[in-house]
Amino acid sequence: MSELTIGILGGGQLGSLLCLGAKKLNINTVIYCDDKDAPAQNYANAFIFGDYKDEIKIKDFINKVDIVTYEFENIPFETLDLINQFKEVKPKPAINKIVQHRLYEKDFINKCNIGTARYVSIKEKSDLNSNIKLIPGILKTCRLGYDGKGQYKLNNPSDIENLNIDFSQEYILEKMINLKKEFSIILTRFGH
């Protein structure tokens, strides 16, 4: 039996793959997920169903694991920060705060001298009219958008008038570019 137990927040496809990989290395896994039907529970050594903001269940989870990771970026920052006070969270919560907000993520990538499509923060409909030069473009929610959710294609300026969206949340408008290929890349480092 393994001496190491990894706690995984989220129970989807990536959590399932992580559990399968850990099993090959004789590492135990505990899944914590807000979906009682999460597929990763079928591959984990243990499964805890609960809301990501339920401190009692989160503390129970903390007591069962040695280190914690997460399989998707929309885990509340406060939850990761709480866990990190007791067990190491990888990637660090501060990283997650960046990747779960599209504008922070783009700004961070640009500060690393990596090019992106042109973009601008949109807080109200008039901001769209002030940034016509970025149309055609994609208007995206800054938070909680994935797989096309929270995205609105603007082919021409007249599409702005037809938008029926809630401007109580922040958006990002990205200039459409002609892609030849799209890659998803994960970088990691071990140690310092």
Feature annotation, model-predicted:
Residues I98-H192:
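Active-site nucleotide/adenylate-binding loops and adjacent lid/helix of ATP-dependent enzymes
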Residues M1-Q100, Y104:
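ATP-binding N-terminal substructure of ATP-dependent carboxylate-amine bond-forming enzymes
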